[in-house]
């Protein structure tokens, strides 16, 4: 069952991979743009997935207006930013590499996919806890 990998595409050939991988803490969600040179990628734990899901919805409601950045800390510290010029894009920044840009055409499908992967990640976390006890 794991790793679980799904690919979202847009009408222009853009690609966004969303995967769930086992991790000692339970699970990680990996977002990657294989269509972009350097294949930018972001690793998120459950907290990061929850914040990203909320930020996607907030961005949808905010466009064409600005939205304050969101920051999460911890092992997978990330900054979420809404860019508006020249088009709406979510930029995810981690210290370990280049920003991962997610254009607006991906947002709805990514939100739906994050709902699914969050459930898988919680289950992997539950299994990891059961192994420890």
Where are these regions (language model features)?
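Positively charged, low-complexity terminal tracts
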Residues: 1-133
């Amino acid at each position: 069952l794991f790793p679980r990998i799904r690919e979202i595409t847009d009408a222009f050939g853009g690609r966004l991979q969303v995967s769930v991988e086992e991790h000692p803490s339970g699970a990680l969600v990996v977002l990657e743009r294989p269509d972009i040179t350097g294949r930018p990628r972001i690793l998120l734990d459950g907290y990061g997935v929850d914040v990203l899901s909320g930020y996607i919805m907030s961005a949808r409601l905010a466009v064409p207006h600005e939205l304050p950045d969101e920051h999460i800390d911890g092992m997978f510290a990330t900054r979420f930013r809404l860019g508006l010029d020249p088009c709406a894009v979510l930029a995810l920044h981690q210290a370990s590499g280049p920003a991962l840009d997610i254009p607006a055409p991906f947002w709805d499908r990514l939100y739906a996919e994050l709902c699914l992967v969050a459930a898988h990640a919680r289950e992997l976390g539950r299994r990891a806890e059961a192994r420890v006890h």
